[in-house]
Amino acid sequence: VHRMEPVVDNIPARKLDQIAAVFRGHFTTLGRVAPGLTGARRLDRDMAKAWVDAVFGRCTLCGRCSLNCAVGINLPAVFKAARASLASMGLVPADLQATVDIALETGNNMGVSKEDWLETVAWIEEELQMELDDPTARIPVDKPGARVLFTVNPREPKFFPLSLQASAKLFHLAGEDWTVASEGWDLTNYGLFNGNPQQAGTLNRALLDAMERLGCQMLVIGECGHGYASARWEGPEWQQAAPPFPIVSVLELMRDYLREGRITLDPTKVAARVTLHDPCNLVRHGHLHEVLCGGAEHLPLGF
């Protein structure tokens, strides 16, 4: 291992050892009585500083280490617990906490105002109609009872609005009954990373409130791995209740469109060979490997 990663502090076992040392120091008899024999430590200022570096600075919670762990330890769960301890002490890195704070204050992590969001949607709708030469192409907003409530990453209206246009085009061509929300449209949740379950639950609640307000049938999480993980898997834990509607990734929906023939692909448009990446939150944590492969088999490309 040391040849693969010469920086010892980057090795997952080293990070785990720092957390386990504190556990032994506080919660085991031998660790309290004879810390020198067990390597036990108290959670003092120096150890807290070391934790910040280990679980925030040197860990993304991707879970790759657990796949290679000889005894199957769920390392991301341990590191999340350490982050929660640090969050309770106000030791979340400032830039990460600032992202959470702006989402709590404005409803999205980019601070996009409601007016700007709706203006962007209206503009992209016009662009979509011109692209397709079809005045019926729409981006519905707050459509009651729509089958699909589509949520987006705030970077799209802020920096990459054509991504929203591409999604809207697919929904239109598939004949989907869909809508976006005027409020509760941000799929991201950096509370997944800062270790504060109360703040994470508040951000997650915004999506659930939008679903309840509009009476939609399915919550679709757009392109974002951690957004899917937080809504689909962590959300029920934060809310202590399962949602009364399905929560799916847009990848699952696109896979279904391809299988059902609601959209088709032209093999002459793309000639490049590509490979399929199994991302951490969608595959290692989200269990969507079969979904990705099921969609990929419909693509007119060589893998």
PLM feature spans:
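Long, charged N-terminal interaction/targeting segments
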Residues: V1-V8
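Iron-sulfur-cluster electron-transfer modules
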Residues: D9-S230, E234-G235
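Redox cofactor-anchoring modules in respiratory/redox and cofactor-processing assemblies
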Residues: P12, A20, L258-F303
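Short, structured patches in soluble enzyme cores that scaffold and shape functional sites
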Residues: V152, S249-L251, D278
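Short, solvent-exposed amphipathic alpha-helical segments in soluble enzyme
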Residues: Q165-K169, P236-E237, E290-H298
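Short, structured coil segments at secondary-structure junctions
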Residues: A174, A241-P243, L299-P300
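Conserved beta-strand segments of alpha/beta enzyme cores
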Residues: D177-T179, P246, G302-F303
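Short, flexible loop segments at boundaries between secondary-structure elements
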Residues: Q240-T268
